[in-house]
């Protein structure tokens, strides 16, 4: 038997690559008259397929051998209509037999253990052929991140019981708080808020929730991949039937598209939940990076890390993303721990997406860091190598996040909005998407995702409360924290780049000071729709800023001339002020923007530039731009903890 280190030596040899690299189709190829299964297993001595009628339980209907072909591919033809039949492979490698699902499975039974052959058009939602990716103007590209479970788990959300915490909750129209007909929730709330995209936390099949058990006491964010090309069963109304999760996932996407909202998929190719997974059971050790002794490298912090630089691993990742883009009409992809992928793989993926019809509209961005030390010895897709990435691959900018609200690893560390001394210097860098700074080697502002909160770490509200108080009352409507929340939003929603927000940030979402709730209770993680109604003024503030931003396209421009056009004022510290002229012919509602940030608890007097300026937002109301003109000039007052915005008329 080979040792893990010997497998590593083999897999990294040029001879192995020449003999086994394969560019053709893999997985099930369905036809009404028969289905062909193809599996890449170059180190196997024998491969067979086990056939089942059900996704769990029941006896095996029979076992058939696969034939070995060139480049490490095995295949078998199953005559007759195989739609709805389940299967596993038994792969014998170096004297050990592994029973596993198909790495290229399109759907599966309970907990993803058995793959299912699927005739997708047979079960697609009505008019699915007419669904398409949404074209979102750059000025409306704001991302709202949510878990499928969190979106509608609250009993007060107004969604029917059977759909709560499921894909189908995104399809129900007309929901209101406690079904009282007043405050809109879920899909109707999103439409009113005005975001351009919803980023869904993992919706592929993950292993940390048991789909065969009630979900009452189970919860996980889902960063535990089991089957990359299969929707998660616990989000369907019937995880025992493989076709249901596929159809309902597509219904969710179609509903969001019909509402004019794009769908971004959070993908986690950097690691898998267990080492006993379809990839490692098919070709042990190949798909995961190894330490010199052959053991798994752990740059993900989850026990293993995907070897994107190995040719067939790269093919798998690209094939999978293409499948979701084409079969599910996904509008964008957010890459978890993108620093664990090599630059070449990410750039090849970007080029491959661009080659699809309409593929240049598909967004690509990710976390430009790792979860630990890695054995990736090629250029990593991280912040340091941003200049090597395609200009159309973006990154989460933790520089912007930390300067605005304070570091995420120290609960008490303040940022600019909490009065951190000297932080105003870096606010200017954030406004210009760091394109006028040597901190980040960005090609253009469109590479920068500007944000202050995401699912990781403290919610924005909890962070503000932890900095302000030794013993925070998280549920209280604290007026000072509310003002700081508005200021934080006023800053990053006027920064260049693409804004991003955690769902509920706009209504002071709290997790009671817990910074990592990936497997905490459903009640702690779910969106609190009563709180959304309670903090409706804050919701309206975000809504107004989103609308204002859409009226001034240059904030979302991708050219490097736009950051260079920002003019900063010399003001009393720690105030920050700047102007940006509209780009010629971009349809902006105002000739220029003039923005001031006041992070102090006092009113401040400043002088506007020459000209006539309309007050668009005063730091409390962000919808003044919609009303009658209030023309300002000369000296004006900035409210405490405020972002004040003027438009030149």
Report the location of each language-model feature.
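Conserved alpha/beta catalytic core and glycan-binding cleft of carbohydrate-active enzymes
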Residues: 118, 350-351, 355-356, 360-507, ...
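C-terminal accessory region downstream of the catalytic core in glycan-modifying enzymes
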Residues: 52, 477, 481, 527, ...
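Substrate-binding/active-site clefts of carbohydrate-active enzymes
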Residues: 149-328, 337-357, 374-375
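Conserved, mostly hydrophobic/aromatic
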Residues: 39, 89, 146, 200, ...
């Amino acid at each position: 038997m080979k040792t893990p280190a010997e497998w590593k030596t083999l897999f990294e040899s040029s001879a192995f690559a020449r003999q086994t690299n394969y560019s053709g189709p893999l997985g099930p190829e369905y036809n009404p008259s028969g289905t062909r299964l193809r599996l890449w297993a170059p180190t196997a001595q024998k491969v067979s397929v086990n056939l089942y009628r059900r996704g769990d339980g029941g006896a095996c209907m029979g076992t058939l051998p696969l034939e070995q072909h060139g480049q490490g591919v095995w295949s078998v033809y199953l005559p007759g209509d195989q739609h709805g039949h389940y299967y596993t492979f038994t792969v014998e490698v170096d004297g050990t037999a592994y029973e596993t699902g198909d790495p290229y499975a399109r759907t599966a039974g309970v907990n993803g253990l058995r793959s299912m052959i699927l005739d997708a058009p047979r079960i697609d939602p009505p008019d699915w052929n007419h669904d398409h990716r949404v074209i979102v103007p750059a000025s409306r590209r704001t991302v709202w991140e949510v878990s499928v479970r969190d979106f509608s788990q609250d009993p007060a959300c107004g969604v029917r019981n059977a759909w709560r915490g499921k894909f189908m909750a995104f399809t129900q129209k007309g929901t209101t708080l406690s079904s009282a007909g007043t405050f809109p929730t879920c899909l109707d709330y999103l439409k009113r808020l005005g975001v351009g995209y919803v980023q869904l936390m993992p919706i592929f099949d993950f292993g940390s929730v048991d789909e065969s058990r009630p979900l009452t006491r189970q919860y996980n964010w889902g960063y535990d991949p089991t089957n990359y090309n299969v929707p998660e069963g616990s989000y369907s109304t019937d995880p025992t039937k493989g076709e249901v999760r596929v159809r309902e996932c597509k219904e969710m996407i179609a509903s969001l598209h019909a509402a004019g909202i794009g769908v971004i998929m959070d993908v986690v190719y950097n690691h898998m939940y267990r080492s006993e997974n379809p990839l490692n059971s098919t070709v042990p050790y190949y798909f995961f990076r190894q330490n010199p002794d052959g053991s798994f490298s752990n740059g993900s912090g989850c026990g293993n890390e995907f070897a994107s630089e190995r040719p067939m691993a790269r093919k798998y990742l690209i094939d999978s993303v293409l499948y979701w883009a084409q079969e599910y009409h996904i509008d964008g992809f957010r890459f978890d721990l993108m620093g664990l992928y090599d630059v070449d793989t990410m750039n090849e993926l970007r080029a491959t997406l661009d080659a699809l019809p309409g593929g240049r509209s598909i967004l690509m961005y990710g976390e430009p860091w790792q979860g630990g030390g890695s054995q990736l010895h090629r250029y990593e897709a991280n912040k340091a190598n941003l200049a090597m990435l395609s200009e159309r691959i973006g990154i989460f900018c933790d520089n912007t996040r930390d300067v605005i609200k304070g570091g995420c690893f120290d609960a008490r560390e303040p940022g600019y909005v909490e009065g951190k001394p000297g932080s105003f210097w870096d606010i200017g860098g954030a406004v210009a998407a760091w394109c006028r700074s040597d901190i980040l080697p960005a090609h253009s502002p469109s590479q920068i995702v500007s944000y202050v909160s995401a699912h990781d770490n403290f919610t924005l509200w909890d962070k503000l409360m932890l900095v302000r108080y030794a013993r925070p009352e998280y549920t209280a409507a604290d007026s000072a924290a509310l003002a700081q929340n508005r200021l934080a939003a006023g800053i990053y929603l006027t920064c260049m780049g693409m804004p991003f927000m955690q769902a509920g940030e706009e209504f002071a979402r709290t997790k009671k000071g817990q910074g990592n709730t990936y497997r905490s209770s459903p009640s702690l993680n779910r969106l609190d729709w009563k709180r959304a109604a309670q903090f409706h003024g804050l919701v309206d503030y975000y809504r107004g800023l989103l609308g204002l931003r859409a009226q001034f396209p240059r904030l979302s421009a991708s050219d490097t001339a736009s950051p260079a056009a920002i003019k900063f004022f010399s003001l009393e510290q720690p105030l920050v002020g700047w102007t940006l002229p509209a780009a010629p012919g971009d349809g902006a509602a105002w000739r220029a923007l003039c923005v001031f940030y006041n992070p102090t608890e006092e009113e401040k007097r400043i002088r506007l530039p020459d000209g006539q300026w309309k007050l668009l937002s005063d730091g409390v109301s962000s919808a003044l731009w919609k009303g009658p003109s209030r023309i300002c000039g000369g000296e004006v007052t900035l409210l405490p903890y405020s972002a004040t915005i003027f438009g030149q008329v």
